[in-house]
């Protein structure tokens, strides 16, 4: 198993040496099967959970027009939400049944803890939290969603 994943810009890595299982091949696997979806960047299994990790960094020096990135736009929310739903199939095909946390690692100009919490709350409205409560007794699709900076991700011992 590859233990160190490099994000698409080559600027940061995610160390998964302590993971039970991890992959950054979800997009490649779907593409090879002729299926075009919106998927998360990384899937990481620890001892208790599956982490679906989406990464976006508009603060890189190579970012084109980072001020134009607005993560609270309806279209951006829709894409991030769809990545969660589209990636659930992959976990099912691999018979990964642990509870799921959806983690959005986000860096963008003027981003702060308050805006990330607002975004997290907005995502909660689009993800199946209320559906799980309304329907009830089956397996939960998601247990937690967080929007974190790189520093917050690095400091969170549960991730």
Predicted regions and their residues:
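Short charge-dense sequence patches
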Residues: 28-42, 66-77
């Amino acid at each position: 198993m590859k233990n160190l994943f490099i994000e698409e810009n080559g600027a940061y890595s995610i160390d998964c040496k302590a993971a039970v299982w991890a992959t950054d091949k979800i997009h490649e696997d779907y593409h090879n099967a002729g299926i075009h979806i919106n998927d998360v960047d990384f899937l990481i299994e620890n001892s208790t959970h599956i982490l679906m990790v989406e990464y976006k960094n508009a603060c890189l020096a190579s970012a084109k027009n980072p001020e134009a990135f607005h993560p609270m736009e309806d279209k951006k929310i829709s894409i991030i939400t769809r990545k969660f739903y589209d990636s659930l199939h992959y976990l099912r095909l691999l018979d990964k049944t642990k509870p799921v946390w959806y983690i959005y690692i986000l860096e963008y100009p003027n981003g702060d803890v308050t805006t990330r919490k607002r975004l997290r709350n907005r995502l909660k409205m689009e993800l199946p939290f209320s559906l799980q409560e309304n329907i009830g007794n089956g397996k939960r699709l998601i247990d937690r969603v967080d929007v974190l900076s790189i520093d917050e991700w690095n400091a969170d011992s549960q991730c």
